Curated annotation (Swiss-Prot):
This is Large ribosomal subunit protein uL15. Belongs to the universal ribosomal protein uL15 family. Pfam families: Ribosomal_L27A. The keyword rRNA-binding applies. Binds to the 23S rRNA. Keywords: Ribonucleoprotein, Ribosomal protein, RNA-binding, rRNA-binding. The keyword Ribosomal protein applies. One of its GO terms (biological process) is translation. Residues 1-13 have a biased composition (Basic and acidic residues). PROSITE patterns: RIBOSOMAL_L15 (PS00475). InterPro entries: Ribosomal_uL15, Ribosomal_uL15/eL18, Ribosomal_uL15/eL18_sf, Ribosomal_uL15_bac-type, Ribosomal_uL15_CS. One of its GO terms (molecular function) is rRNA binding. GO terms for cellular component: cytosolic large ribosomal subunit.
Length: 154
């Protein structure tokens, strides 16, 4: 027996019923009954509709806030020290599994220590992280506008 010869067991698969396709079976109302809200296309109430009374969601108080700031993929200094190599860009960090979400910018933070000279290409970095990398003989390369901000912080 070969892979292309495999077939499902007899009677285990059933064709989908095509409704509303002529008078041969489920035609006219297509199993929806006559008239009424449930018979219309796009019918149905929202999942939180409670028959017209104030919904539970509107009765409970609001909590927290939505942060309008940028959400970063965060990398710690200590994580860089464990990795092989001395130059880290986004691709290298993704390969190492430190960056998971590709649509988020990468930020370097100063948690942990870096004991060798490394070059790091990131979208943002804390001032303490930049100092720590430079103290170890390395450098942090940021987009232009951010580089000036980090230098002012020193």
């Amino acid at each position: 027996m070969k892979l292309h010869e495999l077939k499902p067991a007899e009677g285990s698969r059933k064709n989908r019923k095509r409704v509303g396709r002529g008078p041969g079976g489920t035609d006219k109302t297509a199993g929806r009954g006559h008239k009424g809200q449930k018979s219309r296309s796009g019918a149905g109430k929202g999942s939180f509709f409670e028959g017209g009374r104030s919904s539970l969601i509107s009765r409970l108080p609001k909590r927290g806030f939505n942060n309008v700031g940028t959400t970063y993929e965060v990398i710690q200094l200590g994580q860089l020290d464990v990795l092989e190599g001395d130059t880290f860009n986004r691709e290298a960090l993704e390969l190492a599994g430190l960056v998971r979400r590709k649509n988020r910018p990468v930020k370097l933070l100063a948690t942990g220590e870096v004991t060798r000279a490394v070059t790091v290409h990131v979208d943002a970095a804390s001032a303490a992280a930049v100092k720590a990398v430079e103290a170890a003989g390395g450098k942090v390369i940021l987009p232009n506008s951010q580089t000036e901000d980090a230098q002012k912080a020193e």
